[in-house]
Amino acid sequence: MAVVAAIVTVASASALARQAPPKTTPPAPNGGPERFTVQSDGHPVALWARRPSAPKGAVLFVHGRTWSGRPDFDLQVPGYKRSVLASFAAQGYAAYAVDLRGYGATPRDASGWLTPKRAAADISNVLGWIATQHPALPKPTLVGWSRGAVMAGMVAIASPQRLTNVVLFGFAFDPELEFGDAEVPPKPDMLKNSTAAAASDFISPKVTPKEVVAAFVEQAMNADPVLADLKGDGEFNAFKPAQLTTPVLIMFGSDDPGVAVEDAGKMFAAVKSDDKQLVVLPGADHAAHLEDTHDAWVAAIINFINRPPAKR
């Protein structure tokens, strides 16, 4: 059988059951996003959205380790186009960004902790809810950034019927290695976040205007003043690329210090799906979607969603 796979370098560029209808907040008068509250196994999960009147597809974005959905995917910078949600909505997609437990507008649960399996279950439930909002459309495309990419991969393996494609952005690992549990205190630390942490993902000034960094620092600190407490990283071992049958796009910036090209190649080769692509964004680092590589990042995902079939 022919392998439908591609390695691409992009040219640089400036258990969802019946439930009550979710709470929703309409778009703000100043053009802010819609906000929904989706119940996931009895816990309220905040979901942000920008949606055209007649979408042709749906996409769910999952944030990483430190910051929540809105600063990561709906960043507002005067004079710059950096909102992922707005860019996808402008191209006809209903774009959603989730706040996982303990992030942004989603409260912690009684445990105070968030584990990979709990996060993956919430993401799966949100995907199910999104599908009910767009019953005539294909199942959503799932995009995870950094730590969120691993959880997106877990969801794609455990619940492939909930999504059409999965995009793993800003993450790669050697599949022959295993994740381990880090030591955690008896109770969550509830540590304050810092402006230094907010700026840390922006590495190259060549693709990151200072206005973008300043806006992200302000909006990230407002959304997530307290660091979420995580544990159970050994659960990430549920992400086994050899079990991933969903069409997948693996994408990272060429200057992302957290991604080794060799590891990305090993992970790409291990993916079971024949329908897979690997995209490298030249000059981009870990926050490629917020930098001057924003348009190239958006285009790579939309091109993957719209790829023609290998056979006619």
Region spans (language model):
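Short beta-strand/loop motif that positions the catalytic acidic residue
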Residues: 244, 250-252
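Conserved alpha/beta-hydrolase "acid-adjacent" motif
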Residues: 257-263
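Short, surface-exposed "cap/lid" segments of acyl-processing enzymes
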Residues: 54, 59-93
